[in-house]
Each structure stands twice: as C-alpha cells, then as structure tokens.
C-alpha cells in the first residue's frame, strides 16, 4: 500500500518535471540573448550603468564567498576594490602596461593583502574580525592620500600621467604605449563597437567567468569544506578540513575578486580618488551580497542590480542619504530575512512544494 502510494504521488508530477530542464535551458538562452543584445538597444549612459552593476556584482560575489559560504565577516572589501583600481590606473597610465597585465598584478597584490588581513581570522571571528576589516576600510583612503606622489593624493588619478613624471627621454621610451593608455579603454577598430559597448562585453565575459569560478568552487569539495567551517569550525577540523588554510586562502581569493571589480571600476571611470573607496563602498558591497543572499551565487547579482538601481533613481542632491538607506536595509535584512532575497525565494519554493504534495496525497491514497 505504501509503495503504490509513493508511485502514485510521484507520477502526476512526472510529466511537467520532464519539461523543466528544457524550460530552464530555454530561459537561460533567452536571458543570454537579451544580455548580449542590450548594448545595441540602450543609450551609452544606460550601458555604463549595466557595466557598473557588473563590477559591483563581481566584488559582491567575492564577499559572498567569504561571508556567505565561509562565515567570515568583512567590512573592508572596498579597500581591496580600491587597491585593484589604483594598481590598474598607475600601471597603465604611468608605466604603459597593458590592461591585462595591470589586472593580473592587481589580483596578485589583492590576494597577498587579503591573506595578510585574513591571518587574524585564525584567532578572531565575528564582530572582532569585522572591526579589523573595518580598520582597513578606514585606513585605505588615508594611505592613498599619504602617498600622493604615486596615487595623486586627495585629487586622485586620471588618464594623464602624474605631474613631474620622468624626463623627456623616459617619456619617449614609453612612448606610444603610454599614449594609448591615456586614451582609456578603447574598442579595437575591428569590432565596430562603440567604447561603452566594447567595455560592456569585456565586463560581461569577466562577470560570467567569475560566476562560473565561484559556482564550481562552492559545489566542489572545497566548497563543502568552507560551509563546514562556517557551520561548525571544530567539527570541520575533526572531519579533516584544514581550517587555517581554508580560511586564509578564502580571504585572499575573495580579495582578488574584489580587485577584479576594482580593475573594472578603473576601466569604466578612467579615474580613481580616495573618496571613491571609503567605508561607504564596503558597506555597499556587503549590502549587495546580503540583500540578494550571501549564501547563494545568484544573490549578489540581484543585490547589485538593486543597489545600482537605487542609486540611479535617487536624485543627485540626495545621494548622500543612500548610504543611510543601505545601512538600514542591511540591518533589516539580517533581522527579518538573514538569507536575503534568495533565502526568501527558497522558503516560498519549499512551502509551495509541500503544499502541492499535501494536496496530492489524499488523491494518491485513494
């Protein structure tokens, strides 16, 4: 009787279930087509806004990996993003390096700094770790101002080489390479694309690669180890997880992803300044991750869309209030819906599934 009931319960669900994979694939195909075609249909300002969503999402994904999957709280990821942006501007403008090389150096530098900052995580957790990273976010703009000869000080850096850079012979040596860098991130002639469209597609490729990297990582044995550490560090260590190495390397990897977001920031804005990388940016990234759902991969992308969208609709003279709004939203979400939007979605999905199963149960038993 029980076996037949089990069969009869599952059989009504089977026909639509067979269509789900095709529906899912079709949805992703439509989504991909829309994403690829958007730059052709939108104005330049709107394309740049979508590019902003992508660099915020990349940095928020790195933060979600650290906070949502590994349980380490960081209020300093704005500093890692700023490091990536400054390294990119300095290397490309002053030394004529390619954007690719500058990005690689930025990622390595952020990884090293992330590992150094992550070392205290071996001893402290929770609010105390958050305070350590908060100190980093607070210090970063001051450090940028202090080393003004390199960073441009409180004014920041743009596409022009820093004042007094080198003599005429050195400028001639760098020559054409540096001149090209001072033109910004331009679309190659063979693409036939406007600069904003080319930038969008490059950002899209980077965002997709980062998304796939994080997805594969969290679904691997390493990802299961990260979650085990988050849930119970002692039990994870007993189970054979190398807790110290996992925590430090995760911090470094998370910082590297934020630095990629910083590279994208520099490419998009063609300028950096200390005021762009204050504690407010770190809070914004944390809100993007937590609001969408730091324990999911899609969540930070949703959160980034909302964050950038809110900035877009808030009047220019009221932008200073957005950080207050984001802070309030962060507190509210952590109290009411710790899993963020994706957490609420999963709960509703589970309730609907249980409700459907309950409705089918009486007919199945008859």
Predicted segments with their positions:
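Transmembrane alpha-helices and adjacent helix-loop boundaries
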Residues: 2-366
